[in-house]
Design a protein with these regions (language model features):
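Conserved C-terminal beta-signal and adjacent last beta-strands/turns
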Residues: 424-431, 440-447, 453-457, 580, ...
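Surface-exposed extracellular loop regions of Gram-negative outer-membrane beta-barrel proteins
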Residues: 105-106, 343-345, 401-404, 466-469, ...
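Transmembrane beta-barrel wall of Gram-negative outer-membrane proteins
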Residues: 206-348, 371-375, 578-581
């Protein structure tokens, strides 16, 4: 399939360019004055002009709020929240119910078990805007529950500009305070490992061809001789203990530029845009962690008490370049290439007691590189003489990677190195997820009776996705008498695993990779849609649409060392999904109504019956091959009132009904392995209110001030069937990660003097963070509020200064089960100073 549509792209491009060039020459002829008809009205707000319930966040809001990435910015949209600092929940629904697109193309994910790309990967510096559409329309993928997030990258420009931005900042609990550090490679400051953490050459040679690293056995004549194992063990970097030193300030740098060139005497021109964004930040946290077990009735007994201390160094490095060919105002072709990178270097130590150890010390050293690279070729063509024919096409080749080299984990029990199988580990994992996508959208306009404007639209998408995930795990095994020397086992690991202690008399390296650690997966989507909009005199609009999707997905879990062992999970669907929306416009009031039927499909690993370990959480997970696709019915109503030039108020209600919703479950009280089930039913309903109002009613005092806010109340219920309950405590509960209340408020000061000041408040209510088991209630992340302040001063036409203060109140983040604390920590207050210069 891939090669068929790849071969078709040049034909399509050449054909459209030929038509465009012909149109260009025609337009260059002597112009003729024709009748001018007014068929619409000026729409200052994109969400006002659309036929769907939506929100748009653009550059103006990015600047006002001072948000560095899209995950921070989207939580300010009504009904949206951010979980874990990077996953966006729309109307309380998790990432499985949301779709992320970039310039129309489906995005792959660098995360091993998450289908949606984390939004913290996208800096606001490279994006023009983000459309969040909360009602379904047939032009978008049918995997839709909460909404679709359409990320729009910055485009080439029609004028010259060059901007440079630099900032410094810090946190009160991190900057100039002692934190964990560990020397690495020469390119760590760029977020690239230079090979310092890579497998040694001796290890690479030993495991080449998917060979397993194990001690030679005289029985099966397989394995590696002890002298070679000794050499391999000594070749590992003997670095386990990190330093404690004062942490530096956070820094960032961004530059963007653009220009255009005309092509001869024609109306054609080439324009281009480029940007580079870099940031280097530090974050230290101390987290209290507790575990509770039933003690009779509603009383819980503490089984674990731990103190987590960690430092994270994050480096973001992104670049984008876009070049466009505008043949005239009606025809353009654009090529956009970008690379988004985020490195997280995490060092942590956990101390305390657990069920199996009264004196535990657990240390983790983790380096993760995430990258998304994209190349997109797009064309937009408008033929007004052919019933206002519009043809938009795109081809995208996008790849997401996650690389975690030499992830080290070790623990001491009672002051001695643990002899458990997982007492010391050095893991290497790599994931690549590629998507190739071709899309076509065509629309035409016709005119009917009763001043009706009929817009027909049809198109299709052919998308192919391939994922390859590999993990190799190693650890030092206890062998000879040296490895049981109690005095030695109480020393730092650099002493325990010193070269003289590696060998037949001491420790030897072995492979502990699991049979289900590695998998490949693919899915293919062939989709076609049709849509008709009836617009009666810009007063009443009806949109009817349907989307046909042919979907196939396979996931193959395999044992690297036993080719005969493998488990395949397969999912197929061929379905038609309808969508309907209506808008009634009465002067400055709009009333919207929408209904649609959509789906949510199981992800790659959720279907596979092979047990695997989530490399991000360490949780044991096994899929369910009997999972069914979730069917969703969506109902929406919204009223909007636009008054003044920018002021508006809107209020809406929504209701969603789920058949066979997919939920996490724990089936066994012994091994507590997570799996997935189809719950009996689920409902999600809520109310959303938004307002933007200038405070000019206060007279001269308020004419430079505005208030912007939104509030959402969301109520959801998931019902678990008795046969699927397992050891879950609750048979009914809210959706995991869904807050009942979401609130955003902004008060801004924007005079014409070049000064801007914005006070922002974000609040989310209690939300289920983990389902309870064995009569322990569900775990709830407690309600949290964040207060930020952004001050911007334009000194002249070239210089601008921005000061930011984030999380001013520094409320404690807590997770509780009933009244018992599970974990708690302070994020810290953050301040920064930014300087912009525009040439």
């Amino acid at each position: 399939m891939r090669f068929r549509f790849l071969e078709a792209i040049p034909v399509l491009v050449v054909t459209l360019l030929a038509l465009s060039i012909n149109t260009t020459f025609s337009q260059n002829a002597e112009p003729q004055i024709e009748e001018i008809s007014v068929i619409g009205q000026f729409v200052p707000d994109e969400k006002r002009g659309t036929d769907q319930v939506s929100n748009v966040v653009g550059q103006e809001q990015f600047t006002r709020s001072g948000d560095a990435n899209i995950a921070e910015s989207l939580k300010r949209v009504s009904g949206l929240s951010t979980v874990g600092g990077k996953y966006v929940y729309v109307r309380g629904l998790g990432e499985r119910y949301s779709t992320a697109l970039m310039n129309g193309a489906i995005l792959p994910s660098p995360e091993p078990i998450n289908r949606v790309v984390p939004m913290d990967l996208f800096p606001t510096a490279i994006l023009e805007s983000v459309l969040v559409q909360k009602t379904y329309s047939a032009a978008f993928p049918a995997e839709f529950g909460g909404g679709v997030m359409q990320l729009r990258t910055k485009k080439s420009t029609d004028e010259f500009f060059w901007n440079v931005t630099s900032s410094i900042g810090g946190q009160n609990n991190t900057t100039f305070k002692d934190g964990f550090t560990l020397d690495g490679g020469s390119r760590d400051w760029l977020g690239y490992d230079d090979g310092h953490r890579a497998m040694s050459d001796t290890l690479k040679r030993a495991v080449a061809g998917d060979n397993k690293l194990k001690k030679y056995s005289v029985y099966d004549k397989q394995g590696v001789p002890m002298e070679d194992l000794t050499a391999i063990g000594k070749a590992f970097n003997n670095e386990y203990t990190f330093d404690s030193e004062s942490l530096p300030v956070d820094t960032s740098f961004t530059t963007s530029f653009g220009n255009f060139n005309e092509i001869g005497d024609s109306r054609a021109k080439i324009n281009y845009f480029g940007a580079i964004d870099y940031s280097n930040s530090w974050d230290s946290n101390e987290v209290q962690q507790n575990r509770w077990v039933p003690a009779g009735g509603e009383i819980l007994s503490q089984q674990e008490e731990l103190n987590f201390q960690g430092t994270e160094n994050s480096v973001d490095l992104s670049g984008i370049f876009s070049v466009g060919l505008d043949l005239n105002e009606n025809h353009n072709v654009r090529l956009t290439s970008l690379v988004l990178r985020k490195m997280d270097h995490r060092l942590s130590r956990t101390l305390g007691y657990i069920e199996s150890s009264d004196d535990l010390e657990r240390v983790e050293l983790e380096w993760i590189e995430r990258e998304l690279s994209s190349h997109q070729l797009q064309g937009d063509h408008y033929f007004p003489e052919f019933n206002e024919l519009v043809i938009n096409w795109r081809y995208s080749d996008i790849e997401a990677n996650r690389d975690s080299p030499d992830h080290r984990i070790y623990r001491y029990d009672g002051g001695e190195l643990s002899s458990r199988g997982n007492g010391n580990q050095r893991n290497y994992s790599f994931l690549t997820d590629t998507t190739e996508d071709f899309g076509l959208d065509v629309s035409m306009v016709f005119y009917g009776p009763a001043n009706a404007t009929i817009t027909t639209k049809f198109g299709g998408v052919i998308s192919e996705k391939d994922r390859d995930s590999e993990i190799r795990r190693y650890g030092f095994a206890f062998g000879g008498p040296i490895s049981y020397d109690l005095d030695l086992l109480q020393q730092p690991l650099e002493t325990i695993f010193a070269p003289e202690n590696i060998g037949p008399e001491g420790f030897y390296i072995r492979e502990i990779t699991r049979a289900t650690d590695n998998y490949t997966a693919q899915n293919e989507l062939n989709a076609f849609y049709g849509e008709v909009e009836f617009n009666f005199d810009d007063r009443l609009r009806f949109t009817l649409g349907a989307r046909q999707e042919d979907f196939t997905q396979t996931a193959d879990t395999f044992d690297l060392f036993n080719p005969t062992y493998g488990v395949q999970a397969k999912l197929e669907q061929d379905a038609l999904m309808p969508a309907f929306s209506a808008t009634f416009i009465n002067n400055d009031h709009q009333f919207r109504l929408a209904y649609s039927e959509t789906v949510s499909r199981p992800d790659f690993r959720e279907l596979s019956p092979a047990m695997f370990t989530n490399p991000m959480t360490g949780t044991e997970v096994v899929g369910n091959p009997n999972l069914k696709i979730t069917d969703i019915k969506n109902y929406d109503f919204r009223w909007e009132w636009y008054f003044g030039y920018t002021d508006y108020v809107s209020a809406g209600i929504f209701y969603k009904e789920f058949t066979n919703p997919i939920e996490a479950s724990i089936q066994s009280p012994i091994n507590r392995v997570m799996t997935f089930i189809n719950a009996a039913s689920a409902e999600n309903q809520g109310v959303e209110v938004e307002v933007f109002k200038t405070l000019d009613f206060l007279g001269d005092l308020g004419e430079d001030f505005y208030f912007q806010g939104n509030v959402s109340y969301i109520d959801s219920t998931v019902t678990i069937a008795p046969e699927d309950r397992g050891v879950l405590t609750s048979m009914t509960r809210p959706l995991q990660g869904q807050s009942d209340w979401l609130l955003n408020a902004q008060i801004g000061y924007e005079p014409f003097s070049g000064t801007t000041a914005t006070l922002l408040y974000h609040y989310y209510g209690d939300r289920v963070s983990q389902v309870g088991i064995e009569t322990v209630p569900d775990f709830y992340e407690q309600a949290f509020g964040e207060l930020n302040f952004v001050f911007i001063r334009e000194l002249n036409d070239n210089w601008r200064v921005t000061a930011k203060a984030k999380n001013i109140t520094d409320q404690r983040n807590e997770v509780r089960v009933s009244d018992y604390l599970v974990n708690g920590y302070f994020m810290g207050r953050e301040i920064s100073l930014q300087v912009d210069y525009t040439f």
